[in-house]
Amino acid sequence: MVSTFSRQDQNYKNDDLNQPSKEGRFGKYGGQYVPETLMPALFELETAASNAWKDKLFVKELNHLLKTYVGRETPLYEAKRLTEHYKTKHATTRIWLKREDLNHTGAHKINNALGQALLAIRMGKKRIIAETGAGQHGVATATVCARFGMKCIIYMGAEDIKRQSLNVFRMKLLGAEVKVVNSGTATLKDATSEAIRDWVSNVETTHYILGSVAGPHPFPKIVRDFHAVIGEETKKQCQESFGSLPDILLACVGGGSNAMGLFHPFIKETSVRLIGVEAAGSGVDTDKHAATITKGSVGILHGSMSLLLQDDNGQVQEAHSISAGLDYPGVGPEHSHLKDIGRAEYGSVTDQEALDALRLVSELEGIIPALETSHAFAWLDKLCPTLEKDTHIVINCSGRGDKDVNTVASSLDI
């Protein structure tokens, strides 16, 4: 089997969509599974974020920087040749791309990095740490640290450094110190573990800009809320472009931040299908994949309860994806919750399917998507033949593929 699809019966109530709880739970997922030394920092961060969103000056500064520094709002672009490619006898599927790849630094990651940097300033923290896999979150964090004159340390796995040498250079050029992580699989999971260890040791002076909707509460909510601008803009742009809500939202899922940013403003719009696409790697029936929602079970990783890839003894297993940004054995707790209650659907595609989609989108639209994003595009092959009426699909084009050129060049025969 090369790909899978998971859709639960819809069994949610309105309360299921108002998440997280005061305890930081998304249903049974989430929480704070951290050393006692981090609890005051998490409480401080939760309070700072809550107060910041109520502060008109904070919101004004954030919106000003999103516009003048990041380049928002990003366009909603109709991919007409891709639409023509997927047209069937039964339906014309109009495909729209939310162009997060056009943000400053080339991906959605800067929405969250900028917001958390402003929170760090409010808390008086001048040292910033972050983890990165594909390098995009590292670049975004290094960028905002340069903008605000903050010390920046980025943890990155040795394996990912090999795959993403261009982004490593960009981080260093921006003034960040890149710390190589050789432990474990030397990928994103291990980089995150090292960043958390640093934070435990330096919590008084340091803010950890976690890059996905994972980790202990309040990180999943904070990261989601800073990325929700993606979905808020999309909702408005859909009304302007075709006069209604979209029928389907489609995004890749590793930890799940770009998907959650797109999905969140539509959570209560239950006519809109939410579809996340994970990395099936060499296939979900092998041991080389990162399809956490599809194949995982409940466990605890990096301070949060969620679905994980783990063995019968609860040991976290290695994940695999050609995409460094999806090469993670966990997923954000809200995604696990949305899957359980049937509000969102999740599938997975292989490395080869993602590569084929990257090539197709490049040739048809003149847009080279990131390998992460290409997983979402690949799902169109499975989705479009099932549609029986004219449908508007919005794909979150979460990042550009410049960083992946070396990997793609060694994998595609061009």
Swiss-Prot record:
Catalytic activity of the protein: (1S,2R)-1-C-(indol-3-yl)glycerol 3-phosphate + L-serine = D-glyceraldehyde 3-phosphate + L-tryptophan + H2O
Keyword Endoplasmic reticulum annotated: no
N6-(pyridoxal phosphate)lysine: residues carrying this PTM: 109
Keywords: Amino-acid biosynthesis, Aromatic amino acid biosynthesis, Lyase, Pyridoxal phosphate, Tryptophan biosynthesis
Cofactor(s) it depends on: pyridoxal 5'-phosphate
SUPFAM superfamilies: Tryptophan synthase beta subunit-like PLP-dependent enzymes
Residues spanning the signal sequence: none
Biased composition (Basic and acidic residues): 10-26
GO MF annotation terms: tryptophan synthase activity
Pfam family, one: PALP
EC number(s) given by UniProt: 4.2.1.20
InterPro entries given in the database record: Trp_synth_b_CS, Trp_synth_beta, Trp_synth_beta/beta-like, TrpB-like_PALP, TrpB-like_PALP_sf
Record pathway: Amino-acid biosynthesis; L-tryptophan biosynthesis; L-tryptophan from chorismate: step 5/5
This protein's GO CC annotations: cytoplasm
Segments for region (Disordered): 1-26
Family per similarity comment: Belongs to the TrpB family.
Free-text function comment from the UniProt entry: The beta subunit is responsible for the synthesis of L-tryptophan from indole and L-serine.
Complex formation: Tetramer of two alpha and two beta chains.
Protein name, as recorded: Tryptophan synthase beta chain
Gene assigned in the entry: trpB
